[in-house]
């Protein structure tokens, strides 16, 4: 029990209690103090019992909710370390121990076949793109199932632990027919409000680039963006229901009107509540893809999103500061995320600058190549070496162009293999198509500089931040067959995988193939050195390269080969289309056929499909890979039906 000297800020929501008649105050975590014993009429006292009991239960349930989240992360993190993925070094050790050039994996155990069969069955059902694409976007069924589980879990905690009833109570100084109607709508509205507060730090976690979730689970931060978006929508619905509940109570159920409403709506906590709701609605409207594309632009949306989100959290504290135990962690997580980004950038660019012979900060100077393409967008390639640790294949960096805006950075995946040379430098190579905004501005700068340079080469400075993302070749042992499917500049995602594979020891039973769709035959020049290396080293591996030119007339049937019996074949397939015609499904490679034929020709082992390209291509890949997975066949030992998809599914606007 507390003395009666409790600060007024704690008593501002008195809940029909008369503190002047209180003998003691009972504290309730996250809520107003309660007067004990109750000095109101019996109906009001019964109602207050329900209110405070429901709130205490709600705080307990938020604890259970967060304990569930942390428990899942703990089990996941321990599982990743207790049962790590098999790595190529395991194959090397097997070779050394058996003196065999190609390691023979032991027959899968009962446990291994069980896990493989379950994983394959889950991919078969949960990998395809979810229905209602106009609502959920290009997300998988798995993400939709996770969202449904989260929503159901929150729905349960929204309703349990509340005594539902109705209490009609008299009003002092009013006629007998003027009464207050008290219902469980109030406790329920408070419950959904508390849950909205409790979800706030989780929403921040889902949005973090320096993601704690990624560090624990190994899942790239981009995969959590769908949950960040929909957690925000859940918070919006909870806030609307919370507000609607108390508007009905204060504006209709409580009497006399409009006196009760007028007195309530001018209270500071109510004003801050309306401000927070307004900001939340604005955040929701500004997140629409149409608004971002046609009104705000992505960079303005991103920066405005940060500002409005922080002001929104501040308004929540102003609305009900007793629940800031949920909000302060959200602010801390956001600040730590930003500071970690600065630290990453500093680690890459601060220190002794060997070329300049000084200590300090220095950007990276990249050699730029330019391909003019007025129809589909100009293309730029950047090449430079930077002193740093090697990243993992599949990770990406955020690049800030010093000749553009210092307040913007864009994610790009290096197409180069991350290898440290004898002086500690790692080569970076990037390709991007200038669709608009900052990339178009940089492409124009490079084009103008090339016109002025007589030697036909130019440079531009970049500032790196990263790396981010997952190691996409984790567990890619020599018995895993590899199919790479790319569209346009998506080749940067799959090229490092292939470059690594062709430098490994040969496994004659392994199947490797690249399917690449480009707009023009000229686009092959983007990665000409890398393609030449694949042709030269891939012959021994039986690498097959199939390139589809989809938007220009080229003599069909072009075929070049290198090597002898184990040769690299490169097929350039084209569909004749007139200039200016719209794209059609027939112009692109049939992804479903490519996957089916690849899996059908696998001799042994599982298959991993790497994909990067437009959303439509990724959608087709998901469907095709899901169809080829079969838990029953994997259980019987047919490993080729254990097909895993690894794709670049970063958010595009």
Predicted regions and their residues:
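Membrane-embedded alpha-helical bundles of multi-pass integral membrane proteins
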Residues: 54-61, 65, 118-343
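Extended, low-complexity, polar regulatory segments
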Residues: 2-39, 82-134
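Ferredoxin-reductase
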Residues: 357-459, 518-519, 550
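Non-transmembrane, juxtamembrane loop and terminal tail segments
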Residues: 89-127, 353-380, 554-581
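Histidine-anchored nucleotide/phosphate-binding helix
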Residues: 414, 491-506, 529
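Transmembrane-helix exit/juxtamembrane "anchor" motif
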Residues: 70-92, 205-213, 288-293, 325-328, ...
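Reductase modules of NAD(P)H-dependent flavoproteins
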Residues: 10-51, 310, 435-439, 444-449, ...
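Alpha-helical transmembrane segments of multi-pass membrane proteins
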Residues: 21-38, 74-84, 150-169, 244
